[in-house]
Amino acid sequence: MPDQNHLLAALDTVPDPLTGQGLAASGRASAVRLEGARADVIVDVAGLAPPDRKTLDAAVRAVLLAVPGVAEARVLLTAEKPSRRIVAIASGKGGVGKSTVAANIAVALARMGRKVGLVDADIYGPSQPRLFDAHDRPDAKDKIMFPVPTRWGVPILSMGQLIEPGKAIAWRGPMAAGALSQLVDAHWGDTELLILDLPPGTGDVQLTMIQKHRPVGAIIVSTPQDLALIDATRAIDLFFKADIPIIGLIENMSGYACPHCGEISDPFGQGGAETEAQALGLPFLGRIPLARAIRTASDAGTPPAFGDDADAQPFHAIARALDAWLNPSPSPVF
């Protein structure tokens, strides 16, 4: 079986484009580790042109996969002070499936070829490590963390990766807000878009996110029921007051199809989020059904959006709408 020394030796066969040294010797390759048959490495590509970064990425993957016993190679590229945008996924109320929606939007965007990462900003109730099956503790350099790669193409950082499972986080607001900043200000490499899974409510974490990290827009998740919509409206008002655009509303848990007879029922009501969006003059991004398959896949750490079946389609449609909002096509000139 290979060990870390085998990986380091392989990396040193790839020359640093700037110094000519091996990648491990030059310090360009770091956080080298072996998990079973999977090799992980972080490569600093600061100072390299995009074509050179791509070439280096391919070379690193090739030498790692050539090590006997290595079946998979995960390479995370990092660079200094990248330009990236942040989109907040929020709700006024807990239990509406916001984290599941955030995870699947990120995965759907990654499948579209977007360089996307996810920050689990729900400091007190982190769930993204479970949704992505990514429980590894993140590495750090100079007290700055590196996101944990996932097999779904979306690197993530979460407080759930830093504490023992089941342990409560008894922090006051300023400490939680500081933790959020550490997650956002991590070594995100060439990630162009960060999906921020916010905790429910309108407290210190949300205010820090708005004041310090300034998302380009926010998506509000709600169930159709009136109680959830009342709290969602409070979250919308917070973003309105901060002059942060609302990209749109999503209605989650919208309709339940009986697995035996196929009859559709609406345990949480029907159309409430769409009606609220119309009343507020906001875009409605779509409905996600209350489906057993989505729940079981999410609990197993397999985001449904990674597939192409019916359960994935609502997430793909929402991701396309978000991508169009972020990258609008130029209007034709007549």
Describe each PLM feature range.
Residues 163-212, 229:
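Phosphate-binding/switch loop-helix module in NTP-utilizing enzymes
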Residues 2-5, 26, 45-50, 55-62, ...:
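C-terminal lobe/tail of nucleotide-utilizing enzymes
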Residues 1-30, 67:
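N-proximal, solvent-exposed amphipathic alpha-helical segments enriched in charged/polar residues
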Residues 85-123, 236, 240:
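Walker A/P-loop phosphate-binding motif and the immediately C-terminal alpha-helix
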Residues 191, 214-235:
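Conserved Switch II/interswitch segment of TRAFAC-class P-loop GTPases
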Residues 17-42, 74-77:
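Short edge beta-strands and adjacent turn/loop segments
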Residues 109-171, 177-179, 184:
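Phosphate-binding loop that captures ATP/GTP phosphates
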Residues 11, 29, 64, 83, ...:
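Residue-level signature of catalytic and energy-coupling elements of molecular machines
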